[in-house]
């Protein structure tokens, strides 16, 4: 949930008055990441270890999530699916772990688990007419400071090495934006 997509989803949920549970890989920075995600609007922040279902119950979070979003795959997706309400969809949009999730048959039968894939490129190809309005809506939220994405800016011509070093940092929580000086070309 501390990825850029996760941060945006948390903020959109907050704007829509939906509760969100942020699940993050614990890379030793939970004490910093947890409070940050809460300021963005996360209702709960959990480390992606052990039983997420038991953690939610321990925190008195009794409503089961109605939607899961996963970009990690493997056991992380299995733990996430275990928390979901019956028939609630788990949407997978990536597999950063490089491992396919493998669910027990009981998830499929008794919980009527639904797993769906999401491919942004395919969605954009089939929804070309919706994209300008969607981007305009997002831009309005950004301009109104209701949607924030953390980033660090570097000048392409003079700070490329610093940007590359920053990109290689483990546990980095910001996106890197390379700025290009005006080259005199108008489009």
Report the location of each language-model feature:
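C-terminal capping/lid region of NAD(P)-dependent oxidoreductase domains
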Residues: 62, 145-152, 161-187
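Flexible cofactor-recognition loop at the NAD(P)H-binding site
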Residues: 50-51, 74
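Aromatic/hydrophobic pocket-lining residues that form π-stacking "cages" and hydrophobic walls in ligand
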Residues: 9, 138, 163
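Glycine-rich phosphate-binding loop and adjacent beta-alpha segment
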Residues: 16-18, 33, 75-146, 179-187
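Short amphipathic alpha-helix with an adjacent loop that forms part of the alpha/beta core around
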Residues: 51-63
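Mid-domain Rossmann-like dinucleotide-binding core that forms the NAD(H)/NADP(H) cofactor-binding site
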Residues: 1-50
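N-terminal Rossmann-like NAD(P) cofactor-binding module of classical short-chain dehydrogenase/reductase
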Residues: 66-69
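Conserved beta-strand scaffold positions in the cores of enzyme catalytic domains, especially
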Residues: 44-45, 115, 153, 175-177
């Amino acid at each position: 949930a501390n990825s850029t997509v996760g941060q945006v989803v948390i903020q959109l949920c907050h704007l829509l008055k939906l509760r969100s549970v942020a699940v993050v890989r614990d890379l030793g920075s939970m004490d910093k990441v947890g409070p940050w995600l809460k300021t963005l609007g996360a209702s709960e922040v959990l480390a992606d270890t052990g039983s997420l279902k038991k953690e939610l119950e321990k925190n008195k979070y009794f409503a089961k999530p109605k939607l899961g979003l996963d970009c990690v795959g493997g056991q992380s997706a299995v733990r996430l699916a275990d928390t979901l309400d019956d028939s609630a969809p788990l949407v997978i949009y990536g597999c950063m772990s490089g491992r396919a999730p493998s669910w027990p048959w009981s998830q499929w039968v008794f919980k009527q688990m639904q797993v769906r894939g999401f491919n942004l490129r395919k969605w954009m190809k089939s929804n070309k007419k919706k994209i300008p309005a969607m981007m305009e809506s997002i831009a309005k939220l950004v301009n109104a400071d209701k949607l924030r994405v953390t980033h660090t800016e570097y000048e392409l011509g003079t700070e490329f090495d610093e940007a590359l070093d920053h990109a290689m940092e483990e546990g980095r929580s910001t996106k890197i934006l390379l700025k290009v000086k005006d080259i005199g070309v108008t489009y």
